[in-house]
């Protein structure tokens, strides 16, 4: 079939398998052209491995450090008549290229929050890898079925303690509008912490450690975003921020557990990028459109692969890591450059419907958004007939 982008709200409901493969190849080429990661990991588990930062971590470990990788994700395959999810095509492409390079690459499809998927992962590590020396935690999910209670909990994107009104960008209608959000209830805050906080990360590390599949000296990191003042009301000081603060708490006990065997656990702070998750946050499209304009003009603009490759090379496995007072690894320092933030703040209230394309890089934002789904990739013929039924050989599918 010939596949064109169809966008509804903050989701593109079509995906392009050839475009997704080309996007993965671009990221691999970036890593291989920037040289190996010295003393990098060799056997890596990535939880949330199919898109965005998790995919970038898998690519960086495999092609920057020659690592065997096991990826966990929750995606949907395509059929002859309907495209699958972008994450499915990304993972199929990654495995193809990794296998061509002689690397082990296998994937588990299922709910990473479940005990079942944790057990299948442990069994696969024991059978195929023995032990892993890096665990990357990069889940972004709107809800979680708690493995102990069976309750399905939802996360909420709301301020805490007060209602907030802010400028946002309606990406469908391409207009600036005021968005008002009521404060989260305590139940909504607790739910967001349960879905997006550190409990599941801790459960993963506990399960892996108890099963004896963590190598001595193993490291783990969970990805987070902190942002600057302009996004704080909705982000760091909001319900999501409560979940992020929970990560900061949970990492301490995880670190103690791994340190006993010469290992380490860190929260890694990454810059704002266009992802399916960030495009759902009301103020982020406007913030990102301004940020892209400023950072591109300064020559400091980065996407997922530049961020994560740099994180592994400079901080996770580097001699002089970028660490903050809380012990987090920081890869977002170029975004937080005061010059960058001051320019974004100065332009924030000046953007109108009329000057949107001149004042911001909304065009770049839209391109990045479509690239998530395999569109707008250079060199891809989007008028060609493609088969959306792409197989991932050897996938362990716990959903069937």
From Swiss-Prot:
The active site is at 235 (proton donor). GO terms for biological process: fatty acid biosynthetic process. The keyword Oxidoreductase applies. Gene3D superfamilies: NAD(P)-binding Rossmann-like Domain. It comes from the Bacteria. GO terms for molecular function: enoyl-[acyl-carrier-protein] reductase (NADH) activity; NAD binding; trans-2-enoyl-CoA reductase (NADH) activity. Its EC number is 1.3.1.9. The record marks 75 as: Plays an important role in discriminating NADH against NADPH. It holds the Pfam family Eno-Rase_NADH_b. Pathway: Lipid metabolism; fatty acid biosynthesis. Substrate binds at residue 225. The keyword Repressor does not apply. Disulfide bonds: none annotated. Monomer. This is Enoyl-[acyl-carrier-protein] reductase [NADH]. It comes from Burkholderia cenocepacia (strain ATCC BAA-245 / DSM 16553 / LMG 16656 / NCTC 13227 / J2315 / CF5610) (Burkholderia cepacia (strain J2315)). The lineage of its organism: Bacteria, Pseudomonadati, Pseudomonadota, Betaproteobacteria, Burkholderiales.
């Amino acid at each position: 079939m010939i596949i064109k982008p169809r966008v509804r709200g903050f989701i593109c409901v079509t995906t392009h398998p050839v475009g997704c493969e080309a996007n993965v190849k671009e990221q691999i080429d970036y890593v291989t052209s920037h040289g190996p990661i010295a003393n990098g990991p060799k056997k890596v588990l990535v939880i949330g491995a199919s898109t965005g930062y998790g995919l970038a971590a898998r690519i960086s470990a495999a092609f920057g450090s020659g690592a065997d990788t096991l990826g966990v994700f929750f995606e949907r395959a395509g059929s002859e008549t309907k495209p699958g999810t972008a994450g499915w095509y990304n993972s199929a492409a990654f495995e193809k290229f990794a296998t061509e390079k002689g690397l082990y690459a296998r994937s588990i499809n299922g709910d990473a929050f479940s005990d079942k998927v944790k057990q299948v992962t442990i069994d696969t590590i024991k059978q195929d890898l023995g032990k892993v020396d890096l665990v990357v935690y990069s889940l972004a999910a709107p809800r979680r079925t708690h493995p102990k209670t069976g309750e399905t909990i939802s996360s909420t994107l709301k301020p805490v303690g007060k209602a907030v009104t802010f400028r946002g960008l309606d990406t469908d209608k391409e207009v600036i509008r005021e968005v008002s959000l009521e404060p989260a209830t305590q139940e909504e805050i607790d739910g967001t912490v349960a879905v997006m906080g550190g409990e599941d990360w801790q459960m993963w590390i506990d399960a892996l450690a108890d099963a004896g599949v963590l190598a001595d000296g193993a490291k783990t990191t969970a990805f987070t975003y902190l942002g600057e003042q302009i996004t704080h009301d909705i982000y760091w000081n909001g319900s999501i921020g409560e979940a992020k603060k929970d990560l900061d708490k949970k990492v301490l006990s995880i670190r103690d557990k791994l340190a006993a065997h010469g290992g380490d656990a860190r929260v890694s702070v990454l810059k704002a990028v266009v992802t399916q998750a960030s495009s759902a946050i009301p103020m982020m499209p406007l913030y990102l459109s301004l940020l892209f304009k400023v950072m591109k003009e300064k020559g400091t603009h980065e996407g997922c692969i530049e961020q994560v490759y740099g994180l592994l090379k400079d901080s996770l496995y580097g001699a002089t890591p970028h660490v903050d007072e809380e012990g987090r690894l920081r890869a977002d320092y170029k975004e937080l450059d005061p010059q960058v933030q001051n320019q974004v703040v100065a332009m924030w209230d000046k953007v109108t419907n009329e000057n949107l394309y001149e004042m911001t890089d909304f065009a770049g934002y839209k391109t990045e958004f479509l690239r998530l789904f395999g569109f707008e990739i250079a060199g891809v013929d989007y008028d060609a007939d493609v088969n959306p039924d792409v197989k991932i050989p050897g996938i362990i599918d716990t959903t069937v």
